[in-house]
Amino acid sequence: VEGVDMSTGSLGQGISCAVGMALANKLDKNNHRIYTVLGDGECQEGQVWEATMSAAHYKLDNLCIIVDNNNLQIDGHVDEVMSVYPLDKKFEAFNCHVINVDGHDYDQLRAALKEARETKGMPTVIVAKTIKGKGVSFMEDQQGWHGVAPNEEQYHAAMKELEAE
């Protein structure tokens, strides 16, 4: 996909790579921005916090971290498996600029991305509150759909529901 330099690989590695890319751009005086997406369950990984600490230390204001905060991971609800909440307060404690949004509201997302571009001297974290599978009755807020693709019948049923919205 054009503009996507890499997939994240194992949990926690994406943000580490993003921090490296953002730092390299700063050192090269390149004004490109780096965006990375984390799952809330992924924030259980220590590497996420090491990378965040580095991003803040190096004042990587060209880095925007978007956290998909849906409280679901492959083995259960994040707050029951190993709670990482409150995410916003944790990222603030690591000296990041934090913006909380409804992850299903495009206007809020656009405004947050604009605010991130305008923030200087620190990385921005957008904590996007979402509902996994939103808009598809049999997928919505269901842990079992984590990492599972729908079969053809399920796909058509899901698309029918989404097109009706």
Say what each PLM segment does.
Residues 1-165:
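Glycine-rich ThDP/TPP pyrophosphate-binding loop and its adjacent helix/strand module
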